[in-house]
């Protein structure tokens, strides 16, 4: 294609080719010149070619000049005896197919401007293909959507090679439409299956792209809201699955389960677990199917175990899931490091939630109170100011455990029946012991810790103490608070005012020293 140098020259040359193709079928071969520019290495030329292709094939779709139905082989049609119009439409449909494939490749272009334009053009074709289907309707009211083209789009977004988070942020706005969201979920299932099947070791970039897309999907809360379609429809048929929230939830579930059944990077486990309780579980058709993922995450230890327990707790209390090892897992997370990790506040917030039921057996609550009290002996002051009210709250909720602080004839310290090495709280014999650790902490060097530990010396008040303000307390905050404390009035040390540097005449100091 002859063209003037520079982007402006390319624009004018492409414009002439576009006008020629749209004006006369005899100029159809000019499409090759337009498609050739899509292969250019110049970023600005590619952008002009994408815009031209968008206008060209958008117009052809609207005018019905592309073949409709199962696309036959180009060679077979061109050498056959079909009419010129049919040959033209089949030939142009093949060119349209080549254009879409190239636009799909451009979703991985180094330039974000090129990727953004390619995405915009492909989604325009999706909308136009939906309005002017390239497949024949099998019956009246048959729901048609350009699924293969849309799979191409989603496949480009879920690239195994590069981070597509910026492009995915542009795509998020299309997830507000019910039909594109529904087909995005279906296409994501296919993309995960394809990539995991092709790569023995799936690149981290793919997992990150997939999570970015999946976490952006949010379902409507009520059935009547499923009516906003990207591909405009004259009417909605009740037989369409895409029009029912129940089907959306089923596909949403399939999408997440297909993703979570694979071994993910640890960083992704944490990201998923942070949103599982409010963004995933409430929207699943069968939330209990998440049990495999949550138990697998629970075995990873540390913060991941804690976050997984949060999801399991929801399944137990809201969906009647039976998980006998729940409190045993939580008990196993209590070790000296729990006071020093960055997720300490979240841990104790969730632990307080898990132990909030007054129907828990006394032996179980006693085991947690005793384990925390034992760990408190080596905990820093900022942690003690939170964990001591935590223990007292457990005693308030469960009066049967108050025997731990009222056992006057209990065993000596060297005969404490509590077994700190026992992993099962039911076998720890905590209820036979006492919280002597709290009495020991009454002699702590920090006065606020000593005061907090002394609460057990009186009858515990029934209203619980809120630990929320204490969860994120730091040593720096305690230090600053101590510095700002106002001390008592100055203590008088001598009732007779001093006179002079050596005191009053006649005093011992004045008798033996002189200032002369």
UniProtKB/Swiss-Prot annotation:
<feature type="transmembrane region" description="Helical">
    <location>
        <begin position="347"/>
        <end position="367"/>
    </location>
</feature>
<keyword id="KW-1133">Transmembrane helix</keyword>
<dbReference type="InterPro" id="IPR016024">
    <property type="entry name" value="ARM-type_fold"/>
</dbReference>
<dbReference type="GO" id="GO:0032040">
    <property type="term" value="C:small-subunit processome"/>
</dbReference>
<keyword id="KW-0812">Transmembrane</keyword>
<dbReference type="GO" id="GO:0005654">
    <property type="term" value="C:nucleoplasm"/>
</dbReference>
<feature type="transmembrane region" description="Helical">
    <location>
        <begin position="297"/>
        <end position="317"/>
    </location>
</feature>
<keyword id="KW-0472">Membrane</keyword>
<dbReference type="GO" id="GO:0031965">
    <property type="term" value="C:nuclear membrane"/>
</dbReference>
<dbReference type="GO" id="GO:0003723">
    <property type="term" value="F:RNA binding"/>
</dbReference>
<dbReference type="Pfam" id="PF03914">
    <property type="entry name" value="CBF"/>
</dbReference>
<dbReference type="InterPro" id="IPR027193">
    <property type="entry name" value="Noc4"/>
</dbReference>
<dbReference type="InterPro" id="IPR005612">
    <property type="entry name" value="CCAAT-binding_factor"/>
</dbReference>
<dbReference type="GO" id="GO:0030692">
    <property type="term" value="C:Noc4p-Nop14p complex"/>
</dbReference>
<keyword id="KW-0539">Nucleus</keyword>
<feature type="transmembrane region" description="Helical">
    <location>
        <begin position="375"/>
        <end position="395"/>
    </location>
</feature>
<dbReference type="GO" id="GO:0006364">
    <property type="term" value="P:rRNA processing"/>
</dbReference>
<dbReference type="GO" id="GO:0005730">
    <property type="term" value="C:nucleolus"/>
</dbReference>
<protein>
    <recommendedName>
        <fullName>Nucleolar complex protein 4 homolog</fullName>
    </recommendedName>
</protein>
<comment type="similarity">
    <text>Belongs to the CBF/MAK21 family.</text>
</comment>
